[in-house]
């Protein structure tokens, strides 16, 4: 096994060196938007959590004020982060060594999922790691990296007890991973599945009950976590995109038109996947299948419900192993994979041009602005495709359960 992954380990070292060179030479500012943060300051999203822990120790309500943070940003995550024990004399561990370790683990896990001797997989792996979402998540050391590692471990784990712990921590940290509780009912004996699924929801309801006041405070500061145009991974990005569409279509008509198109695309992909065998016989005994299903749920939910910064796109990785494994079994799956690769290339180039072309060159900048506005349309198409597949898997599973119940009755 290790011999087969020898090239992967060499590639891990290569990627980590390249990332270090990019960030140490401040080349990242032409690849990711700094969001009012100094180009010499790294791990800004993690720093605000550490500063909140410090201020909480000093007696501040960090959900309302956080003078310990350089930019006075409040705490907008679950209070579980504030339970992290902090020792001032080990500040370098919290602010430097821990982020570097997690980033190295993140990069390693990504690369080890690919067969780098295959050209398509090598290209996709490289594009994903150096994509604007991944670079932004790494540059800011956003805690989505921690959630990513918790959930990918939960998909890999065979223990519902372990999964219960991992998913609970992820949910208490960022809230949206609550949908990944579906993992708890995918495998195991019926009693075991019911017990841990029920225990999770009872625990989370109790947590939200005691956390309610803090959640209200978090939403008072929603400007800190709601992404602006160009930085968003959300259907809302289409409604504010700067393109010729806004000139010819009013906002309300654009919303209606977008929702109709989304429904139409979802229906098409739902219908197209009806006769695909791998979805007809879909089960959760396979790690890639579990990862794919959880990835579908998280990406679809975040896209249609929340207004996320585009580093949330790192969870699209969850669908890659399944698509790669089955790309030769069905042309639709293969085309979706190629579309994802094309989308990565387009986003990288358009984002680079957007960040490097001077605003003073208005005619050129205006055209690039329109170019960037194409990306939300690509997002819509991709998420609608994944939504159709998700609905098809759910429909097939429901049909399978109904047949089993009918068989038991007879």
What do the PLM-derived regions correspond to, one by one?
Residues 2-156, 160-162, 187-309, 317, ...:
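Primarily membrane-embedded glycan-assembly and transfer machineries that use lipid-linked glycans
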Residues 143-152, 175-178, 312-321, 379-383:
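Hydrophobic core segments of transmembrane alpha-helices in multi-pass, intramembrane catalytic enzymes
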Residues 165-186, 305-312:
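Transmembrane helices and adjacent periplasmic/lumenal helix-loop junctions
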Residues 304, 308-313, 328-335:
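Short amphipathic alpha-helix initiation/capping segments at coil-to-helix junctions
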Residues 322-410:
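Aromatic-enriched
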């Amino acid at each position: 096994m290790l011999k087969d992954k020898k090239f992967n380990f060499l590639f891990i070292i290569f990627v980590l060196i390249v990332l270090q060179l990019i960030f140490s030479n401040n080349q990242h500012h032409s690849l990711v938007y700094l969001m009012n943060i100094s180009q010499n300051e790294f791990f800004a999203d993690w720093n605000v959590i550490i500063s909140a822990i410090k201020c909480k120790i000093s007696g501040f309500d960090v959900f309302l004020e956080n003078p310990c943070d350089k930019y006075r940003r409040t705490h907008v995550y679950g209070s579980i982060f504030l339970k992290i024990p902090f020792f001032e004399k080990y500040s370098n561990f919290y602010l430097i060594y821990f982020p570097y370790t997690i980033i190295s683990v993140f990069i390693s896990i990504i690369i080890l999922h690919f067969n780098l001797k295959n050209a398509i997989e090598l290209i996709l792996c490289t594009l994903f790691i150096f994509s604007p979402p991944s670079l932004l998540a790494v540059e800011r050391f956003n805690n989505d990296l921690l959630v990513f590692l918790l959930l990918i471990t939960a998909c890999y784990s065979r223990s519902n007890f372990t999964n219960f712990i991992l998913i609970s921590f992820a949910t208490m940290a960022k809230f949206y991973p609550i949908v990944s509780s579906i993992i708890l009912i995918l495998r195991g004996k019926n009693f075991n599945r019911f017990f841990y699924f029920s225990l999770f929801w009872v625990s989370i309801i109790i947590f939200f009950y005691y956390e309610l006041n803090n959640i209200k405070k978090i939403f008072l500061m929603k400007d800190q976590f709601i992404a602006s145009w160009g930085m968003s991974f959300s259907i809302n990005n289409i409604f504010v995109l700067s393109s010729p569409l806004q000139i010819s279509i009013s906002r309300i008509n654009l919303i209606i038109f977008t929702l109709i198109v989304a429904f139409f695309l979802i229906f098409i992909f739902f219908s197209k996947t009806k006769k695909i065998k791998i979805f007809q016989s879909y089960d959760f005994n396979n790690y890639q299948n579990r990862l794919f299903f959880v990835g579908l749920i998280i990406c679809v939910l975040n896209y249609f419900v929340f207004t996320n910064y585009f580093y949330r796109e790192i969870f699209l990785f969850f669908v890659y192993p399944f698509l790669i494994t089955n790309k030769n079994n069905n042309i639709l799956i293969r085309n979706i994979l190629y579309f994802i690769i094309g989308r990565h290339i387009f986003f990288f180039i358009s984002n680079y041009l957007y960040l490097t072309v001077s605003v003073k060159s208005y005619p050129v900048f205006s055209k690039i602005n329109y170019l960037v506005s194409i990306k939300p349309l690509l997002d819509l198409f991709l998420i609608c495709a994944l939504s159709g597949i998700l609905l098809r898997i759910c429909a097939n599973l429901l049909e399978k359960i109904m047949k089993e119940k009918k068989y038991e009755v007879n």
